[in-house]
């Protein structure tokens, strides 16, 4: 009978009541009521058991058997030693896990163990090494509403990093952009603000962690409020351990190049829709340390706007360019993840091997310091403090790389460190030798060839004899346990040896645990120095990664433009070029933009000619420049850009009821409402999601508006509306096109950008090579010829009226003309201009 069918029976409810009335289940329920939103891992011996609704949820996610305790209580369980794999799967499903451990009997003679929740693991609070994704950051966000501002904190508990910032309630795009960069695996909001955030469009399908305790502070303490919420959540999830976060970094507006979420996605900086390969990050990540890899990703997502920072990075690169990098790279490979090691030390999750990793890191760091001093590289590590830590650890740590994963499962402290420890180890070794010797003697004395002496944690040491020979056991054997195929015994001599071994083990465990804790405390005294060391290592690794990319791909050092112009000579797309098949070369292109006469390039050319690639490579070269990297070009002179916008491609947001065109217009509006004179804007096919004339009118209006500005943002405007090329007569606008070559019935896309405008779109040819059936392609060609012929006839008729026809008069009424003349275009936003244009259009249609 399954669970559903029994749930309606009186017998089931009676059995359930009885089952829940046991001391153990009463204990479970008492603990569970304090952690209702978690799956409770209830330790019972060598297993974590889950009961009731927790069991149903966990068994479904983990694909493990759901059974019933006393025929009523749903339950499932996992071995304690393999919990990480199961916890990881639950976290990926968005669940929280409360780890409830057993310690000692509740009272003398009681079978019920004392149990307490020692840790709550949530998606954003993971610090356990086996649950983290390699070197990747694991962020948690806290949002806090205060009047008209949203304050937010982004923290990685595994590294201790914290970032603070704030945005206006009306400027949510920046908040969304920051969340897109950090991609927090958990977002926390105060209980009183939950409804506000839940109703925002971006968060509609997002689960929040609701912070129950409301923190009251003054108006000026908003960042302090975030700090208190973070610390409160640490106490709640880590249960009174020493985990602390570092000093926060402020993400102030203007310090870094701003990119909205569409730009981050369109440029595929650190991931694309399908994978994390073939991105800007993946192709020039040559870092050898975890810190270096994280730092490279951060700097790609937060390019600098301060030229002083860029010059500092270039100076370091210039020093390294004069040296051989191979020895530095070899040394960097020995570095452990110091940030996470320190976090594990604070969070009571340290491993013995962490000390070996720390020791190797310090040793390599000291060697690097000596080598880099020879070339005057500013490698500012606290050398004296590091030597103190190294000496302290070396005095104690067992040499070699065979340290145990878990304390107690092998040798941790070196021989000679403690006389008492050495004696206990010797006694333990002798005791085990005595066991082997006793087994040999007992086999010979009894003549029982199935006799073996074994050990487990529950029974201890025992003599095991098969059931067939058990009756022949000597009288001095004391029966200990009966199994299906064997009997287990003990004897006075074995018990004596066992006491010796167990006493020795207790001494070893006590000394090693005490010294382990002391070593952790000593290392934490130098945590500030170690974090500074980690930062220097990460920055060196970052610089060497940039130099490696330069050598591998043939990139060059860009120059800073003093006049705000952008000048790329034979630039290339870094990702496309790096992923081309062997023997295939990327065709380079040049571009020049300024803020006056050459500010706005109208880019035309057929589909597949390379318009989007060209625009993306400009953006990626700009980003590489502003992180201090080399760029793929023959030469480059680039400005500091404060905001980078891309409107490339659009997909329906059907879940929000938004069409392709609406999404396109929202993105366009965001750009036109937030650009500055120092922005770089890349528009691709604006207006294609609606009718031809509507779309062209909008695109035309945008270009006119940008042209009318006294200082124009640098803009590339790719379009299929060839009529827009006529706007080159306006100030600041010029034409570019992708060159093609017609050869018999073929079209060659030459991928070369030239000054001027494209002659054809070649859409029918693209349809043909895409596999559209031949009859359809043929008919399309006929229709195109017909339409183009009519278009020419209309133009001729408009240009040369006959003697027998009167010229057509434009029936604008005086009121409309007067309204147009009164418009103050310089005071109108682009959206207001579009709305006014739409109103005039409606009036003219009514006149017709």
UniProtKB/Swiss-Prot annotation:
PROSITE patterns registered for this protein in UniProt: DNA_MISMATCH_REPAIR_2
Binding positions for ATP per the UniProt entry: 605-612
GO cellular component: cytosol
The keyword Protein transport is annotated on this UniProt entry: no
Entry keyword annotation includes DNA-binding: yes
GO biological process: mismatch repair
PANTHER family the record matches: DNA MISMATCH REPAIR PROTEIN MSH1, MITOCHONDRIAL, DNA MISMATCH REPAIR PROTEIN MUTS FAMILY MEMBER
Its job: This protein is involved in the repair of mismatches in DNA. It is possible that it carries out the mismatch recognition step. This protein has a weak ATPase activity.
The protein's name in its UniProt record: DNA mismatch repair protein MutS
Gene that this polypeptide is encoded by: mutS
